[in-house]
Structures are given as C-alpha cells and as structure tokens.
Amino acid sequence: MPFQKTIKSEISLTGIGIHTGKKINLNLIPAQRDTGIVFYRKDRNFPIKAKLPFVVDTSFATTLGVDGIKIRTVEHLLATLHVFGITNVFIEIDSSEIPVMDGSAIDFTKAILKAGIAKQGKTVSLFKITKPVYYEESHSKIFAKPYRGFKITYKIFYEHPLIMEQSLSIEINEQNFLNDIAPARTFGFLKDINYLLKNGFAKGGSLDNALVLDEKGVVGGNLRFKDEFVRHKILDAIGDLSLIGYPIQGHFIIEKGGHTSHINFLRKLIETGCYELAEEPYFNFQLSAQAV
C-alpha cells in the first residue's frame, strides 16, 4: 500500500497565468494526513478540493470551481503531485489560475524534489480498474483496462508537418515522469491566437511558456523532444486523471483526447463502477526517496 505523503517544507513560486496574463504567487504548504489536495484562493478566502465533482470547465485547461469561484489550469501541478504520491498539501494562490511557468511541469517537479517528500504513517487506497471501460465523443476515444501499475498510451493527430501522427506508451512513475513527461511544454498554433484572445484565453501566452507553431514549424525555438506534443498530452492526462483522488492502477489508451474527453471519461468510469478501492502493494519506482 502506498503511504499518504506531503511535502517536507513550503514551496513558493511566481509565474504568469497563461490565460489571465496575471502575475501569480503560488505557495505549496505541508498538510496533515487525510487533508487531501486543497487549493486556496487567498484573494477570495476560499478553499476548493482537487476532486472530480468540482470540475466546472475544460476549455483549453481544466478548471475547478465552487459557487462561482474558480481556479484554472490546475493540470500540470496536479500531475506532478500525483506522480510523486503527494496526497496532502495546501496550494495557495492570489489569483484565479495556477501559473504556467515554462509551459511544462519541470519547475513544479524540481521544486517538489528540492523541498522533499514526507511519508505520513497512514496508507491510502488504490483506485484500481477492474473491468474494461470505453468512452467515445466526437473524434476522441478512451479505453481503460486492468493493469498492474499505471500506464498511458496516447495517440494524437494534427494536420501539421511537425506533428501529424504521434503516439507514445509509457509507464507512469517518478523516473519516467521526470525524464520524459514533465519537460514537455504546452503548444498552440499561430493561426488560432486571435480566436483565443477574443474569447478570453491565452492572454499570458508567449514563446517563453508555450510552443507556438506556424505553418512550417516552431516559432522562435526548438523542441525538447521530437514527439514533445504527445508527451505534453500525457502530462495533461495525468493531471486530469488525478482528480479521481487516489493513486491509480490501470492502463489508459487515449486517442485524440483533451481535457473535456478526459473528464467526461472519468465521469463515465465512476458511473459504470468498473473499479475498486483496493488495499494491496503499489508498484511505482521511487525517485523521491533518493532525491530528498
């Protein structure tokens, strides 16, 4: 059984909200066991738990909300917390969005490893897929099946010469996340920028925090991986799937997915009951024990 965990010391980061364009101060604070992952809007004096029922929007990011108070773009930070097994932490922000940092999860990953991770002497159940589950909407398809571990197979297709069809299948553990997933940046297309801005998105987007593609390639930068695009989609998927609220056992096969299909799939998964909260050994490579 995995143990509940928190961070050993407080983390403070500052960055820009990719959609709001605002400067945001972010603090991660250790929390007692059984607290869960709790976002706290300091500017509104309001907490929101990182749980599936509180997802209120999935337009170009995953947004949590209660009573009209929202926190946008939670997926990269949640993915990092999930992979490193952090189950209890307060996340304080002074605005309505998690800072995008460089568009990836690498800054969050480095900060958490530097702060250290503490076991809290109490176990947490596993969310274990027990029967195959299939979901389809528009062009997106998601299939989950039982698996001894946590694995994601992702396939994307974009009519762009740098992307076209990309696919990757990867075990989700700390080492693979640090090396292969966390550094992958969010991406968008130059042709879509006017639409995004007109509709209140990407006000803080720049070449410093996103891969921007014109008709031929990346504008003003280079790829970290040849298949950085599908790797980033896996990062998003981990963050969205983490809203289940438990460590996950299962193999998730996703084709042309996005935040909306990820979240709708989770809702169907809960409805079908093809899972159990299990108490058994959890196989996940532990990098944090070596790094703290």
From Swiss-Prot:
Keywords: Hydrolase, Lipid A biosynthesis, Lipid biosynthesis, Lipid metabolism, Metal-binding, Zinc. It catalyses: a UDP-3-O-[(3R)-3-hydroxyacyl]-N-acetyl-alpha-D-glucosamine + H2O = a UDP-3-O-[(3R)-3-hydroxyacyl]-alpha-D-glucosamine + acetate. The keyword Lipid biosynthesis applies. GO terms for molecular function: metal ion binding; UDP-3-O-acyl-N-acetylglucosamine deacetylase activity. InterPro entries: Ribosomal_Su5_D2-typ_SF (IPR020568), UDP-acyl_GlcNac_deAcase (IPR004463), UDP-acyl_GlcNac_deAcase_C (IPR011334), UDP-acyl_N-AcGlcN_deAcase_N (IPR015870). Its EC number is 3.5.1.108. Zn(2+) binds at residues 76, 232, 236. It is an enzyme of class 3 (hydrolase). The active site is at residue 259. Pfam families: LpxC. GO terms for biological process: lipid A biosynthetic process. Pathway: Glycolipid biosynthesis; lipid IV(A) biosynthesis; lipid IV(A) from (3R)-3-hydroxytetradecanoyl-[acyl-carrier-protein] and UDP-N-acetyl-alpha-D-glucosamine: step 2/6. GO terms for cellular component: membrane. Its cofactor is Zn(2+). Catalyzes the hydrolysis of UDP-3-O-myristoyl-N-acetylglucosamine to form UDP-3-O-myristoylglucosamine and acetate, the committed step in lipid A biosynthesis. HAMAP family: LpxC (MF_00388). Belongs to the LpxC family. This is UDP-3-O-acyl-N-acetylglucosamine deacetylase. It comes from Thermodesulfovibrio yellowstonii (strain ATCC 51303 / DSM 11347 / YP87).
